[in-house]
Amino acid sequence: MNPVNATALYVSASRLVLNYDPGDPQSFTEINKLLPYFRQSLSCCVCGNLLQDPIAPTNSTCQHYVCKTCKGKKMMMKPSCSWCKDYEQFEENKQLSILVNCYKKLCEYITQTPLARDIIQAVDCSADLLALLKDGSPLHEETEKSSDTALALCLTHSPVPSTSELTSDPPATLTSKPESTQNVDIRGSVINGLPNCNGLSVDKLGVNIPSPEHANTIDVCSTGEYMKNEDNSSSLQPVCDPVSTSDLCTTGIDICSFSEDIKPGGSLLLSVEEVLRSLETVSNTEVCGSNLQPSLEANVTNGPFLQLSPPPLSHNIFVSTDASPHGISCTAATPKVVKLNRKRSRSESDSEKVQPLPISSIICGPTLGASAPVTVKQENKMSLQPVATVPNGGTTPKISKTVLLSNKSVKKNLEHAPKKSHPKAKPGVLKTKDKAKEKVPSSNVMPGSPTKTVYKKPQEKKGCKCGRATQNPSVLTCRGQRCPCYSNRKACLDCICRGCQNSYMANGEKKLEAFAVPEKALEQTRLTLGINVTSIAVRNASTSTSVINVTGSPVTTFLAASTHDDKSLDEAIDVRYDC
């Protein structure tokens, strides 16, 4: 698979960096926008770091890559990519490895150009770009050698005078010493202002100050690269004179990296004498077993150091040696080791807010059975039910009975409550009564806790819309007019209207009028009312009576009809029921 996106971003970023003009702010803005995208295209989708031994899916068009060590782990993408779910299709990608190396070389090149100085001076994007440069720059590897420009990123930016200026001032000139006693070894300079260092620039440096008999050399060592040192005919013997074997339990000071108490651009500078004076307070304690992690920032382009052996010490020291116009001066910054006024933790601040309430305000009867004081946490949030408190010099306020009643008592009250139902009652009254019945507490109600109310779903209304279509149900809705069921061509079901004239049946057909076809009308009526008619006897027009034999379900009224010529409508109709 060809990582087209990462390749295109690398070409664009390289073109911008090579054509960078310090006087053009637009070019710096473009680099600031493009470089993070290039770094993101070379990120592992599992760990998020720069790719190491990258592998990529073979039969996929997505630009998702992972490290070889992260193969099989869950990716951080949401939603997940459907094209690269199967890790069996991932293979090593040589082009990605080349792009990662190109990214590192590009970052190394940036540290040696004026662009690095502009990145440090920029306030908005300094931290982000410096983090990218640290991630890609191989300055921390032992195989690479850094130049003076690269080291300027991690050392203090103070003017460095020449050797002639150092020796021109007699009061500040120190005693000379041979060049063979100078031993300066600095390894591992990184970019200043990175998030991992909080403004510091060296990964791990150590400065060791020995007893007076070995006070002629200083060894500054760490992991990284060697730095070129210049010959100087001055030493730090007067500075190291105040140190004695009684002050230090062993032969020196070990200074490592720390990353907390010093903010970027705000390092504290103290003289070496003040640092050594502060070390005298620690001379009575055993400092050989402590392993604290301070860091060192040193500019040793002009000035020798005394070589010492590195036993650990329990002080955090930040040393910066800058050459001044009047001589070599060693300055050090001591970060705060012990914070007297430390910040309170969240648990401590929360525990101070907890105040116990009197028992009498919580125990309201024998049913609760509480015998221990209950602590209530004070909060600013509004609660559903306020907690009853006892005023100063007063008595316990009464708590409403609804809060103290149990489930059974509430249910009993609801069951024994008089139920009034009237068909012509107002709907507003019915709704309030239904809601009151639906509210049933689920558990024993404790004071101070919100009551849980369970709402039941309203029962669906059965029957047709006749008389129920409006907000005010009425039995006179369909009287004298067509009902809504007739308009929808449906039969009425449990109709509450009086005089409803809907002629539709359940099967969707209309009823025939009784005077049209008597036999058909009776059959349709039987289907509508569900009557089993075994025999229907209708006498001729000449007969005086009509006898109808009906068997089936009891019917109070039955429709009987005769022909148009039959004028004996006032004669009796005999109906027999066989139950």
From Swiss-Prot:
Catalytic activity: S-ubiquitinyl-[E2 ubiquitin-conjugating enzyme]-L-cysteine + [acceptor protein]-L-lysine = [E2 ubiquitin-conjugating enzyme]-L-cysteine + N(6)-ubiquitinyl-[acceptor protein]-L-lysine
Domain of life: Eukaryota
Record's signal peptide: none
Biased composition (Polar residues): 441-452
ZnF (RING-type) residues: 44-85
Recorded GO CC terms: chromatin; MSL complex; nucleus
Domain CXC MSL2-type: 459-510
Annotated positions binding Zn(2+) 4: C464, C485, C492, C495
Biochemical pathway: Protein modification; protein ubiquitination
GO molecular function terms attached to this record: histone H2B ubiquitin ligase activity; promoter-enhancer loop anchoring activity; ubiquitin protein ligase activity; zinc ion binding
CDD domains per the UniProt record, alphabetical: MSL2_CXC, RING-HC_MSL2
Residues where Zn(2+) 2 binds: C62, H64, C81, C84
Entry's EC annotation: 2.3.2.27
Residues annotated to bind Zn(2+) 5: C478, C492, C497, C500
Biased composition (Basic and acidic residues): 431-440
Binding positions for Zn(2+) 1 per the UniProt entry: C44, C47, C67, C70
Region (Disordered): 161-181, 413-457
Disulfide bonds: none
PANTHER family: E3 UBIQUITIN-PROTEIN LIGASE MSL2 (PTHR16048:SF3), MSL2-RELATED (PTHR16048)
Subunit structure comment from the entry: Component of a multisubunit histone acetyltransferase complex (MSL).
Function of the protein: Non-catalytic component of the MSL histone acetyltransferase complex, a multiprotein complex that mediates the majority of histone H4 acetylation at 'Lys-16' (H4K16ac), an epigenetic mark that prevents chromatin compaction. The MSL complex is required for chromosome stability and genome integrity by maintaining homeostatic levels of H4K16ac. MSL2 plays a key role in gene dosage by ensuring biallelic expression of a subset of dosage-sensitive genes, including many haploinsufficient genes.
Protein name in UniProt: E3 ubiquitin-protein ligase MSL2
